[in-house]
């Protein structure tokens, strides 16, 4: 669709809240409630943002946003390969993200944005949907499983 010039400037999809990856997300995270998972693409050849809004008071232990960040950072510090394909970025005051920043890479960035007053957070993953995509993630998962 992009090559044919038929893509909207920005488009969220899976708005039926039944994205095909939700069963895997539930399995891998141990969540008992389905998260609101809304991926989006735009009028650029490669790149995407995946957003997962969270109500912090509904999570076990009612964590703060900093706790989510620290848990993600600790997990990826243990499981990342030397290439550091997944990076958990520190909190920032810049509340905008460009979806195409990681074009032509196998990188994935995770960031937690939050409003502690309202006990809400959004976990955002930024990736090149073609560079990272299913095949890049599969290779990364195989390396993890094999201890490489």
Short names for language-model regions:
Residues 107-148:
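NAD(P)-dependent Rossmann-like dehydrogenase/reductase catalytic/cofactor-binding core
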